[in-house]
Amino acid sequence: MDLRYIRNNIHIKEEDQQRIKDFPVLIGGCGIGSYIAECLLRMGFENLTIADGDVVELTNLNRQNYTNKDIGVKKAIVLRDRLHAINPEANITVFPEFINQDNLHEIDLNHKVAINALDFSSDIPFVFDQYMAKKNIPVVHPYNLGWAGFLTVLPPEGLNLQSLEKAHETFELNVGKFIADSLRAKDIDAKWFEEFLAEYGKIALISPPPQLSLGLYILSGMVSHIVFNLATIKPVKFFPASYYLSMMS
């Protein structure tokens, strides 16, 4: 095994370590995607494409993989440099533009899995999912719940997030209802999350969902595990099934 990954030994078989090295992953969105990208790289995924046209802002620093000196610089550029500082030999492709209907086709889609960490301030995340489905690429949807991580995986064929009940004006609240319903169906105490949704509902029209670094750290591990399972052809649950991890009762 490559000396860089020798401490992965036993946890990851040598043949799987080699498999994930060349497994191409697309990360759409370098906010939540910033720590996911680093976690994947440190595991051994060395073929990553990161796409985002946003710049680092002060309000990102409570949770995203950036520092004060990065403010004003494009996230994709900063993240590429950080990833190359970790592994200079990694193949990090950058698309430092906001993804839209006109440029999505410009991204080289020789990928095996996509991570949709785009902001739901428009319909672009849905366009992203539809485009990946046409290319037969499964899509991982991660959600930072503050004190928890939640994700679901969309298969190329089957239900997608547009099938969610549209009970609220903002998509984030509709996803929140889906998450709360999913937790209750598994007999998981969702009271803390329901209380959060009630408070967030008061500001949802003017603010994106509040998030914590803790939730993103949890989520990065969850997403990386799912991508590893996809890469090594291990079992994965697909939407509407989901994954949740938290220490909240």
Residue ranges: model-predicted function:
Residues 1-11, 229-249:
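Phosphate-binding loop/pocket of nucleotide- and phosphate-handling active sites
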Residues 1-26, 58:
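N-terminal charged helix/coil linker that caps or initiates catalytic domains
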Residues 25-29, 50:
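Hydrophobic Val/Ile/Leu positions in short beta-strands of Rossmann-like dinucleotide-binding domains
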Residues 32-33:
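Hydrophobic/small residue at the entry helix of a nucleotide-binding pocket
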Residues 47-87:
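Glycine-rich phosphate-binding loop and adjoining beta1-alpha1-beta2 segment
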Residues 102-110:
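Short amphipathic alpha-helix with an adjacent loop that forms part of the alpha/beta core around
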Residues 111-214:
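E1/E1-like adenylate-forming module used to activate ubiquitin-like modifiers
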Residues 156, 219-237:
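Oxidoreductase and adenylate-handling cofactor-binding alpha/beta cores
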